Each structure stands twice: as structure tokens, then as C-alpha cells.
Amino acid sequence: DQVFLNDLDGFDADYEPEGDFLSGSNFEYFYKHMAKYMGPNPDITKEERLQLIEERYGKEIASQEGICDKMLNIDQTSTSMTSLIPYSNYCFLQAYGGGTGAGGWPDEKVVYCCNMGDNWQGDMQSMYNQARYKPANGKRKGGFGAFFIHRDYNVHEYNPEPYYRFRQCIQIQNPAIH
């Protein structure tokens, strides 16, 4: 409800199975239910989605521009849950060791994320590696990111000004045109 009531861009479903109820097939059921309202979904038309949104949230919200285009993303520690590829805009892969393997996920849907939360005082080489990574198939990757990116605000020997490393990685992946 928060996505529609607060006009957010979408939802990030965190999948970290620890033997709890929302693991495996239960998570898949939950995610596909969310996909009725947001994200790509081969099982529903935009008209059907709009009707569901109007029934749940009313005409005022349903009439907002782009209401049927909210994103649905999975945030996970592995490249599992490939059954959810058709229902996902992106897979935020918690590749905290600096890896770049997409597994069964298409490279263009994977956003590789490093752990700045624990490693902010280091050189963050893993983030640079993820920003530089280019898939062998020539397609674009989904991007790169970091857990606790706000810690890059801190100035220290590897970070001479706030967000210096993060801005450098943005330029590596998506260079400015001068």
C-alpha cells in the first residue's frame, strides 16, 4: 500500500531465506501477488492492472500518470529465484565479496551491490570492480550500488571528499559527455 499511497517508484522485496515463513515457494507466491500491481508481468495486461489498482486504491490514485509502471525488484544474496525474472525490473544482488556473476539472471537486470556498511574505511575496490564490469555478451548490466552508501560521505585517507568514490564509480559506468 505504501508504494501507491506515497507515490513511490516501486518496491524492493528483500529475499534472505533464513528458514522463516517467507522463504522459497511462499516468497514466490508473495512476489507474484505483488506483481499484479507493479513490475513487469507477462500474466496481466495494463488494463487489468489498472482495474486492480482502482479497486484497491480508488479512482484518484488510479488516474495518476505512470501508476501502472511501478517497479518491482528483488534484493537477494544469491542469484536464485530465477522463476521471478519475468516479474522483476531488477535484481539487486548483494555481492558483498565484490563478485559479478549473474547466474541465471540476465545481466541487464542485475545491479551488483557491495558492502560499504562494514567496509567504508577501506578503498572500496569491490565497488570500482562492479562499476567497471562489462558482461561478456556485450549487453549492459543493470548497474552497481552499495549497502549503506551514505557512509561514503565520511572523509578519510581513501575518500578525500564526501561521496568521492561513489561519484567516480558513476563516471566509470556512465561517463559524462563533455
Residue map of PLM features:
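Secreted glycan hydrolases and related glycan-binding modules that recognize and/or cleave
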Residues: 1-178
